[in-house]
């Protein structure tokens, strides 16, 4: 068994000077022990296999490009590549046969058939062991990265753990009283921070060049609900490493400059963006990316590839939010956009670093992190609020102004308690008027055909909206989001006996569409959010296993007439 590398010596701390005039941040790292430096990352399959990888993906040997990215070489990739170069031009060469001989392809997961007559809660509780994986070791050339403890995967084609998905899955594990699994998953992410200096998109070599929305602070906070301040002190070094990754290079930035994930605006405000260290097609979506880049010959392909990868880092892959033309994916420019949700999450990380530092008895660093959080909050209110529209939005580095598009990301400042109260009420009104649909919260109001646009609704965004609105006393709108999404989940489950990755919220009882792959079932984060919402709408003394027939009253709010579930045609 791998021992999690949760080392506590030589931890990272920051000295910060915060001037009132410019809020200039200066970071100085204390020297760290050499053994704590991240290891050299293993190479992804597109580099290991070079032309062989490109050829297999280019002829679309497999319907899903992720299949070959996850295939395991049976011997040294250099030897396989040498054999390929000798054989590929010979008469009668069969590429599929060559792949079958030299690689072990990922197995299709066994089709899970749930027992008949299960309630929604019973179905989810029965899925936890089905979705649990253990990978204490992996083959030398496997793209899968081993983790020390068991973990829960989303389901379907996703055979590995994913960063931001996992927090919402963990919410459900906690509701099911699987605190051991919650602790295991936090330990795994701590191990990744110690191993690689960041939490990758997922535990695959081809995901190491990027991260995902930074929810590690939320995970530690969740674990602390069960273990108390010991969890905060235990994972303080890893929280610091997470922060160092996102802020890398900030100390050398001049106003108007960017470095990887950090940007300094013209007025000296420091904020963050999504970034991938590579500018090549994604191995798991190789031909899709090449096709997208070829459709816009006016842009360098490498620029498009990095923006596609950076959108994958955002979790919103893909959305009109990142595009100049909602109907042309090749106009994507993720790296020139400062996302409101990312900066809200980093505000939370700074607040958690302050809390964990205080728990560890380090008041000086706690005060420094509080100052950083205050500076970021000011930056959010100054640059990520659209005063004309009345909602939080992203900042455009090219036009140097806040964007106009309303997306579900507008609720993240409410979710982390960073919003001004009067602005929170405006966000609630905009949400109700433009994003709230019969089946839940729409991701945007734009119908682009991309999966992170209308009419799709995603479980994590439903929870962010629900909790964010509750934080500011917008209980009726919060209950509307909860009730409508749960009704959607229940109707889909009643018809298909499964929970899915995303839902069409323009009605109830329909899975979502769009994206680079078919609709996936399972599904980790939907399971977790559904359990949280079930426990939100039903009193603790009388928990419900399925969605009640009528909408409950929002706590502490004047309540409209009870609404019955909307009937749908099977």
Swiss-Prot record:
Any one cellular-component term (Gene Ontology): periplasmic space
Disordered as annotated region, ranges: 542-570
Catalysis performed (reactions): alpha,alpha-trehalose + H2O = alpha-D-glucose + beta-D-glucose
Compositionally skewed regions (Low complexity) per UniProt: 552-570
Pfam family, any one: Trehalase
Domain of life: Bacteria
Compartment annotation: Periplasm
Positions annotated to bind substrate: 157, 164-165, 201, 210-212, 282-284, 315, 516
Catalytic residues in the record: 317, 501
GO annotation (BP), single: trehalose catabolic process
Job description of the protein: Provides the cells with the ability to utilize trehalose at high osmolarity by splitting it into glucose molecules that can subsequently be taken up by the phosphotransferase-mediated uptake system.
The protein, known as: Periplasmic trehalase
Gene name of this polypeptide: treA
